[in-house]
Amino acid sequence: ALANTNGLLALCRDGFTEDSPGGTVSLRSDGTATVDYPMTDTLRAGLRRGSLAMAELQFAAGAKEVRPHQLGQPWFTRWDAYKQAIQAMPIEKFQTRLGSAHVMGGCAMGSDPANAVADNNGRYMNLDRLSIMDGSLFPTSIGANPQLSIYGMVARLAAMLAAELKPLPVK
């Protein structure tokens, strides 16, 4: 029954090293977006470790059945059988459920328009009167539960912007 169902999520941080570059979003010739996320050996190892850690935790907590995130896999009733299967299981594109949590990055801050989208005050470099104030200003994900980091950055940027704004004349 649903009341006895549990799900876990393992976060793999990427974008910090050459062997774990993270994904890219680019535009096709017709203007639509395409996403590419390379399945590197480093990512595979992280997914395998995460799957094993989550299953071990679930079995230790009394789970009767645990199922891997890889498509087409059976339910397992014993930790040792699960561990053996995961260690042997290929982890390939379109066979492993991947998702994203705490999406951040994409609008890097900096002083050089060749390497940044926004200046150090969160202002978009290519359009006046547009500020970016959210997690997209981080270079990449900073890990789980980023709300305090985002709040702190946005509070600072918003206070700076508010101090610079001048009231519009009343008509």
Region locations from a protein language model:
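FAD-dependent oxidoreductase catalytic-site/capping-region signature
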Residues: A1-S131, S136-F138, I142-G143, S149, ...
